UniProtKB/Swiss-Prot annotation:
Family, per entry: Belongs to the RapZ-like family.
Protein name per UniProt: Nucleotide-binding protein Tgr7_0722
GO molecular function: ATP binding; GTP binding
Coiled coil listed as a keyword: no
Residue sites binding GTP per the record: 60-63
Species classification: Bacteria, Pseudomonadati, Pseudomonadota, Gammaproteobacteria, Chromatiales
Stored SUPFAM superfamilies: P-loop containing nucleoside triphosphate hydrolases
Length: 286
């Protein structure tokens, strides 16, 4: 049986994630106390013909400090039962979480009389750090809406259904902030910028004219070759450690031209040469 533990900060999209997993065929339970998790798994595996081969459980801070402190032991017990267990952790910037709570008027699970929302968020972040550091996949939803998050989770989880690494190439613009849900971040702002060509300014790195412009510069090919060789060298090492997910982020100034172009080229290369499960996400084009 495959089990995904869905955790993260309140307001970061855990319910959206569980809904997406349910649509993908997972049996989902939200807000399960950590102390009940092992028994829950045993029940799912008890029948001679198990009813559920895919399950997902939402776990939040309400499990309490004692159970959170024993998270590693709980996960070890589950894996000892032969379960393929993965951890999905969602986060978002504090100002975005505050805005979401203001818009939805939902109450934070740690909110107590006299405790400001910002303090509840910071306490939650501290308590859930025990889970966050063990996450197989971390998604930053700061700049992601409900529909984008749904598609992103479906893509990553379905791709990780086999033994192959699920590899995401993500473009972004540094002026909008660096993504924190990355395994590698590469700065490509040193490359020639199509933005300064009036005919290319409104286009993106997906457009042939932008690609042709960048292909004219030898330094762009050199950058691609260097990134390709680096990833070819080190991806097998991550696979050897049984990693299910990897996110490679490439950033230029605005996230429209150079980073998009390189993300697409690298994704095409690794799809063709290694047969990996590869997807792309262009944060600023969303």
């Amino acid at each position: 049986m495959k089990l995904i533990i869905v955790s993260g900060l309140s307001g970061s999209g855990k319910s959206v994630a569980l809904n997406a997993l349910e649509d993908a065929g997972y049996y989902c339970v939200d807000n399960l106390h950590l102390g009940l998790l092992s028994a829950f798994v045993r029940q799912l595996m008890a029948p001679r013909m198990p009813l559920y081969e895919l399950a997902a459980v939402g776990v939040d801070v309400r499990s309490g400090l004692e159970e959170l402190d024993h998270f590693d032991d709980i996960m070890a017990e589950i894996r000892a039962q032969g379960v393929e267990a993965q951890i999905l952790f969602l986060r978002a910037d504090e100002d975005i979480l505050l805005r979401r709570f203001s818009e939805t008027r939902r109450k934070h699970p740690l909110a107590r009389k006299g405790m400001p929302l910002v303090e509840a968020l910071r306490l939650e972040r501290s308590l859930l750090a025990r889970i966050a550091v063990r996450a197989d996949l971390t998604l930053d939803t700061t700049r992601t809406n409900v529909h984008q998050l749904t598609h992103l989770i479906r893509d990553r989880v379905e791709q990780a259904g086999g033994d192959a690494l699920s590899l995401l190439f993500q473009s972004f613009g540094f002026k909008h902030g660096s993504p924190v849900d990355s395994d590698f971040v590469f700065d490509v702002r040193c490359l020639p910028n199509p933005y300064w060509e009036p005919r290319l300014r409104s286009l993106t790195g997906r457009d042939p004219d932008v690609g042709a412009y960048l292909d004219e510069h030898a330094v762009v090919q050199e950058m691609f070759d260097s990134l390709r060789d680096f990833l070819e060298r080190w991806i097998p090492c991550f696979e050897a450690e049984h990693r299910s997910y990897m996110t490679v982020s490439l950033g230029c100034t605005g996230g429209q031209h150079r980073s998009v172009y390189l993300a697409e080229r690298l994704a095409a290369h690794f799809r063709q040469t290694r047969g990996l499960n590869v997807s792309t996400r262009h944060r600023e084009l969303s």
